[in-house]
Amino acid sequence: MVALAALALSSAAPAAPERPGASTDIAAACGPDGGFADWAKPAPPAKIHSESWYVGTCGITVVLIETIAGLVLIDTGPEDAAPHVLASIRALGFDPRQIKWLLMTPEHFDHVGGMAVIQQATGARLVVSPDAAGAMRSGKADPEDPQAALLAKYPMKPARVDRVLRSGGSLLIGGTRFTLHANPTHSPGSASWTWQSCEGAQCLTIAYADSVNTISSDDYHFNQHSQRVNAARAGLRTIEALPCDLLLTPHPGGSNLLDRLSGKAPLRYPRACAAYAAAGSDRLAQRLAREQAAK
């Protein structure tokens, strides 16, 4: 029993930061979930595991990964968060110009609205899924996106797309392989990423899984778009099957991430991606039931 208790405590303890500026209690620094207001609210950087770092805001996850061939950044947050992201990267002791590759999850302004700004500051190359390329090049939402009418109010600066990577494709960067998993649940171009992170003899597969929420504009009805529903369900199955020792999500609240990074909840938990996908599946079923009842 003592050994089990010690194991539970160690699994919840925050990793000691190994770089200046890294926080051991990002949850306290951010405070209670503020929703939309947190999307550009500065947060201190925090260690995730080994060479992976949280450099996002209080409401939007941005992940920085060290490799021997340079840095990789996944997502940027909205445009007004870009200066905070760059500041967090510098606080960890990195030069943003060390970023060589930019990856992304959904093609929405809250997660990649700052991509053009970060790209200009770093010169890094942007990799996208096929169905996200149009939105990133134009700065405008895909008309097939259930949130298109909402997203039209928040156009993004067009970004330079350097590489289009299909689902299952990967990038080998400095010995770390980043694999793209298309999961068009939240948006047509949604993508999740997995990579291996080793700390000493402990190696984990990190899954940065895109949102499982099927959100839409008020006048959009999923039960009138069977192809979109089928795509969303396929995306949920993809997330359920991800290799997933450690789950990250684009909105930290989607996986209690800030508490987990602060040692207030276990960083890892069994079947995390499967549980995350199941919650999204339940919400989609509830949405379809409400639409059916409103007919």
Which sequence ranges carry the predicted segments?
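Bacterial N-terminal signal peptides
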Residues: 1-10
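N-terminal pre-domain segments of enzymes
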Residues: 16-44, 283-294
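Acidic/histidine-rich helix-loop elements
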Residues: 27-30, 34-43, 76-80, 138-152, ...
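Conserved beta-strand hairpin/beta-sheet module of binuclear metal-dependent hydrolase folds
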Residues: 38-92, 96, 192-214
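Divalent metal-coordination and catalytic microenvironments
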Residues: 51, 65, 75, 85, ...
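Active-site HxH/HxHxD metal-binding segment of metal-dependent hydrolases
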Residues: 52, 80-83, 90-170
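Metallo-beta-lactamase
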Residues: 71, 78-80, 160, 170-172, ...
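Binuclear metal-ion centers of metallo-dependent hydrolases, dominated by the metallo-beta-lactamase
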Residues: 256-295
